[in-house]
Each structure stands twice: as C-alpha cells, then as structure tokens.
Amino acid sequence: MKGVDDTDLVPDSAGEGSRVFHDQLFAESNSAIEDFRFDGATASVFDDMVHRSVPFYDEMQRMTEEITADFAVPGTNLFDLGCATGTTLLRLDAALDPRVHFIGVDNSLEMLEKGRQKFLARKSTRRCEFMAADLHRERIIEDASVVIMILTLQFIRPLHRTRMLQGLIEGMNEQGCLIIFEKVTLNDSLFNRLFIRYYYNMKKRQGYSDVEIARKREALENVLIPYRPEENYELLASVGFSHVEEFFRWYNFSGILAVK
C-alpha cells in the first residue's frame, strides 16, 4: 500500500482541524488483496473515501439532519451506528437541541478516535460518547428517539441482521425513527448491471482508476452484502416498524426511513 505524505492531503471538509488524506488504499496493483477492513489505514483516508465513493454523500447528511430534527427528543439518546469518523454527529451537533444525547458506535477503534478528536476540537457542550461495540453480538440501544445507520447494515452478516434489528427496535422509544442508507442489489439483472456500471463511472469521475475500482470491489466481495430494497422493507416490517418508506434513491443506493 502506498504511504501517505503531505502531497496526499486534501482539504478538511469537516473544518475541525483534523487532516484528511487522499484515498489511495487500492492504487497498488501488485499487493495482495485482503478483505476490506476499517483499520487505521482506512480511518486515515475515510473522509475523502466516502465523499468520492458515495453518491450524494453531502445530501445524505443534509437529509439525515432534516429528518432527525423531526424525531430527536430532548433528554433521549441519538445513536449513530457505524459512526466512523463522526461526520454525521458533528453536523447534527449544530442542528439539534443540546439536550439530545449523542452516542456514536463503531467496531473500529481508529475510527472512533478520529471521531472523538474531531468532536473535542468542536468544543461542544453536548453529552457525546464514542463507544466500541460489535453490532453482531451486542445490544446497546436504549431510550433512543433516533437511530442512524449510514452504509452500516450492509456490513452486518445476513444471519445476524434480524436479531440485530430486533434488539435495536426494543431499545427505541415509541415514534422513534431509524434512518438507513444502503447499497442495494436488484432483481432485474439488466438494471443491476447498468446501475453498477453507472456507479463505477461516478467513481472514475471522482478520480479513481480502473485498478482501484476493481481491487476495492474484490476486497468488499465477502464483506459488503447488499439486499434488494424489498428485502430491507420486509426485514424492517418483520421486526416491528409500523412505517417503512424509501426516501432516497440513486441507482443502487437507497435511503429508508422506518418509524416504530
């Protein structure tokens, strides 16, 4: 893997004084490809990676803020599952009542540390905790008016998704909401192929090479497992959500709002 130096720096979109490195994790064509991991190397380039790899990422953040404002209740908890480097929590901190408690959850200690440092640099007075947890095994949701999963559910092993969501909804308050953004697959093979190609074209426009795209696809093959949109709707309804609706779609990316 290529090292990073000052030539790899890009502007800090969070504006919180942390350095953001240019994503070149998969630029080396000779190194062995391992399963994708949210380790220190990924954490160092993550903010650049999501802005270049996720279509309309800033709009996803804006929509999350807009929806959350209608559901977050002062004195209750807001959970960001798979909070990564804390981008979503930083944005919500400026928008929500300070009495809403924030809990960012991730299984990557390196991601959590970056999120913690960014939040400390903000000098917010809000109660905010960054928690290490494995969503496959641990039930951590309690007194939650809002739960956010931005590109997180797709990394939960399929055999664990129902149980994880059951534990999640049990810890949510009535009329609480779950906001999900997911990569999805489709029943129709024609549309599936087309949408995947359109997505890779988007990544090329963001500066990724064919080699980088192919190597990352292979690294994610057994790690990121997307469902069809209908499977996600049925899964959410089956664990007890009374309202489930898709509110965002870009080819093979979907946003879902579910209310208990």
Curated annotation (Swiss-Prot):
It catalyses: prephenate + S-adenosyl-L-methionine = carboxy-S-adenosyl-L-methionine + 3-phenylpyruvate + H2O. This is Carboxy-S-adenosyl-L-methionine synthase. Belongs to the class I-like SAM-binding methyltransferase superfamily. Cx-SAM synthase family. It is an enzyme of class 2 (transferase). Keywords: S-adenosyl-L-methionine, Transferase. GO terms for biological process: tRNA wobble uridine modification. It comes from the Bacteria. Catalyzes the conversion of S-adenosyl-L-methionine (SAM) to carboxy-S-adenosyl-L-methionine (Cx-SAM). It comes from Nitrosococcus oceani (strain ATCC 19707 / BCRC 17464 / JCM 30415 / NCIMB 11848 / C-107).
